[in-house]
């Protein structure tokens, strides 16, 4: 896997610096993580990769979605700090979407703590992706708040088989 990661980093560096001489290192790291996982999955089990559609959503698209979410909330007089806002990523992969929400939220550490522990969840069926996402999201949370998270927000299950009422983890 290290070999794939090294290839991904070199390939990404070349492409990113051609497009943007001063890229966001947090965005680069999310892309490297997701691309390495995608390449690992394709190399390990190409049938699964094609069947299940293991594809990385580019960080630029995720960032657009996060900005659109924030704009939509602002138009309704709310922010990501609003306790009525709950976010569920049903096909979380390596956690890019939740990570970028935390990184782009503009929330205080206390507001981000509340969002992370009580209103932000991610579901993924692949146990390896769940482990990567869990480590990724815990690291991002600690970088953004300066404190370690109290629990995981990653749920390892099939999104299509969740019984009603089970989409919220018990705290």
What are these regions (language model features)?
Residues 1-171:
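SAM-dependent methyltransferase catalytic region
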